[in-house]
Amino acid sequence: MNKGVSLDNCVPKFFKVYLPDESGDDMVLPISFTRFLPKSLPETVTVRSISGNIWKLELKKCCGDDDTEKFVMVNGWKRIVKDEDLKGGDFLEFEFDGSSCFHFCIYEHRTMCKKIRRSSDQSEEIKVESDSDEQNQASDDVLSLDEDDDDSDYNCGEDNDSDDYADEAAVEKDDNDADDEDVDNVADDVPVEDDDYVEAFDSRDHAKADDDDEDERQYLDDRENPSFTLILNPKKKSQLLIPARVIKDYDLHFPESITLVDPLVKKFGTLEKQIKIQTNGSVFVKGFGSIIRRNKVKTTDKMIFEIKKTGDNNLVQTIKIHIISG
């Protein structure tokens, strides 16, 4: 890849032109950029694209053929290429926050226009290739994991999780436009019950429900946080409807997007998902099917949703999902 470094506005940046024939499994940082890396080198870095995708990559120090010290992002560059559907000649800009996060954007080769983040009403831009039926499907801000992530060419250690990545690819590649269309096609003025999308685990008598609620709170990070428990409705598993009673009881408010934290966060990171608020007050988390698929949730499992809010206005920033096998 062609590359360079910019000091505009004192923000460390570097640029690359994506050349498929020269692009390897990992991404080498420009040698001139290494002086901007912190002295205490992080083991992992976050790459966050303007399209909303987030990846966790390992950062390794290696030596080239001429013994020149190099730094390389390993175990994930091929996923970024796939998730962002990079084309030959696309111009990539990486901006470093000085700690452990790289923000990057893409300028398309043909138009030199920057790809921007989609709104909830725009069509999907991110394409992933289906390995099973060779169809292209649009992705919904999901970490689409590449089963071809081989070991590093830089002798920086083996990837012991390659089989896990392959499994995740098969699970997550079909998180597509259907997730959003199901939500958008619900009329705003039609009342929606809590079990229309993900079935609420409310089929219990009240005495037993109180006992179960107390037992389930043991799984929360903070027992005082709002929470609700759901089981999977196999017919409606592509989006999540926040129960109206929870919103009302805790006077919750929602931004345009929230962070989802699931049991696989240490391996694959968090997921950023869009919020759909209808005129009748119904609140959906769009693209929730990715959580169902990558955790292989069964209809016998319980999903305990812990809502983490900030400030006096009870703004929801994060929902943590605890999955109890049934």
Swiss-Prot record:
The keyword Nucleus applies. It is found in: Nucleus. SUPFAM superfamilies: DNA-binding pseudobarrel domain. One of its GO terms (cellular component) is nucleus. Residues 124-222 are annotated as: Disordered. Residues 12-110 bind DNA. Keywords: DNA-binding, Nucleus, Transcription, Transcription regulation. It holds the Pfam family B3. InterPro entries: B3_DNA-bd, DNA-bd_pseudobarrel_sf, Plant_B3_domain. GO terms for molecular function: DNA binding. This is B3 domain-containing protein At5g60130. It comes from Arabidopsis thaliana (Mouse-ear cress).
